[in-house]
Amino acid sequence: HRDSETPGSAEETDESATLQLETRNPILENRVFMEGAYTGPEFTDEEIQSELEASGLTYEWHSSRGLTRRAAQDIADGAVVGWFQGRMEFGPRALGNRSIVVDPRRGDMKDILNDRIKKREPFRPFAPSILAEHVGEYFEQTHPAPTMLMVYRVREEKRAEIPAVTHVDGSGRLQTVSREVNSLYYQLISDFHELTGVPVVLNTSFNENEPIVCSPREAIDCFLKTRMDVLYVGNYGVRRT
């Protein structure tokens, strides 16, 4: 069928099916690649505020512009930031809507994340999210990778600048972020870039040895039981006291 669609799930298990379809259908033309994977649940401000009230946490509301500026400053200051926004991602990769975001310039940030939250093997790398227009400055390849399925070599002169997302072999499994695909996450990274000169953040999934959080309640629960510093859920911010 000429109008077939094989959606990516930001993982490897669907690649064989996609390749098989392409092999068996040489007449496929005008292929359009899915640039985002934001097809999951989304929650209203009212639903989010209701969960925050039920939790008893102190929170503050931010405008969308104030939200990204404040979060970017927190990241630049070394905070571990929970970032819960918009529709949940489809698949096992956090792509900026159910993410924990930190500063990639700190070489100790991998250990901090593993100690406070992830509790995983120290050799496992963490992923960079980078503004799409800056990919060539930091990586040897420039092809878009919006669903974190590509591993590129980090340019040798940039490895010391972003050590927390540079694997021991000099590679990084990156996510390229464009304003068209995820405008809020793009703005967050842009604000971090403005503060630090680095258009990259470390992005890992918002969870602790459980499935990625889906709802505001799950995000709040994960924040409470880990040593995350700040939680941004929708336009609301919660700071650990």
Where are these regions (language model features)?
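Flexible beta->alpha loop and helix N-cap segments adjacent to enzyme active/binding sites
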Residues: 1-3, 11-14, 18, 22-241
